[in-house]
UniProtKB/Swiss-Prot annotation:
Source organism: Thermosynechococcus vestitus (strain NIES-2133 / IAM M-273 / BP-1)
Chain's gene name: atpF
GO CC, one annotated term: plasma membrane-derived thylakoid membrane
Protein name: ATP synthase subunit b
Similarity field: Belongs to the ATPase B chain family.
PANTHER family in the record: ATP SYNTHASE SUBUNIT B, CHLOROPLASTIC
Keywords (A to Z) from UniProt: ATP synthesis, CF(0), Hydrogen ion transport, Ion transport, Membrane, Thylakoid, Transmembrane, Transmembrane helix, Transport
Regions crossing the membrane: 29-48
Subunit structure as annotated in this protein's UniProt entry: F-type ATPases have 2 components, F(1) - the catalytic core - and F(0) - the membrane proton channel. F(1) has five subunits: alpha(3), beta(3), gamma(1), delta(1), epsilon(1). F(0) has four main subunits: a(1), b(1), b'(1) and c(10-14). The alpha and beta chains form an alternating ring which encloses part of the gamma chain. F(1) is attached to F(0) by a central stalk formed by the gamma and epsilon chains, while a peripheral stalk is formed by the delta, b and b' chains.
Length: 179
């Protein structure tokens, strides 16, 4: 006996005649049973299809979410790798800058030492040249003073002794090719 037959029998009266039951409590239970039976019988396919479609949508959404999670994880790994590379590059640049700074510092110090040595040598040469010029100037002054003193003494002797003056003039003429 099928569900429909059972429902049909419930709808009949005791006597066997088909009729309407006026008892509300019995009719509600019967109506609910009929409704549930109809829904189960006819709604099984629709409900199964709807639940199947919903299950497919959920599975698709889960698969898409997993794929997005994989893509996000790959992007995160790539970003972390780039960050690591950037940190390594920054460290390398820092080390290069320190190396260059040391080299430039050493070059500047060496250049300053060379400049100091050159200035000291130039100062030494200038001092030597100034000393030589001073010595030469002192020699010239001493020579000029000695000549002036010799002239003064010669004039004094010549003015005191006129014969000596004549003798000196005669010798000078003889030296020049005179008598």
């Amino acid at each position: 006996m099928s569900v429909m037959d059972a429902l049909f029998l419930l709808a009949t009266e005791e006597v066997g005649h088909f009729g309407i039951n006026t008892n509300l409590l019995e009719t509600n239970v019967i109506n609910l049973a009929i409704l549930i039976g109809v829904l189960v019988y006819f709604g099984r396919g629709v409900l199964g299809k709807t639940l199947g479609d919903r299950q497919k949508q959920i599975a698709t959404a889960i698969a898409e979410a997993e794929e997005r999670q994989k893509v996000a994880a790959a992007r995160l790994a790539e970003a972390q790798q780039k960050l690591t590379q950037a940190k390594q590059e920054a460290q390398r640049i820092r080390e290069d800058a320190l190396t260059r700074a040391k080299a430039v510092k050493e070059e500047i110090i060496a250049q300053a030492k060379r400049e100091i040595e050159r200035l000291q040598e130039t100062a030494s040469q200038d001092t030597s040249a100034a000393t030589e010029r001073a010595i030469a100037e002192i020699r010239e002054r001493i020579a000029a003073m000695a000549l002036a003193e010799a002239e003064n003494q010669l004039k004094a002797r010549l003015s005191q002794n006129p014969d000596l003056q004549r003798t000196l003039i005669d010798r000078s003429i003889a030296l020049l090719g005179g008598k």
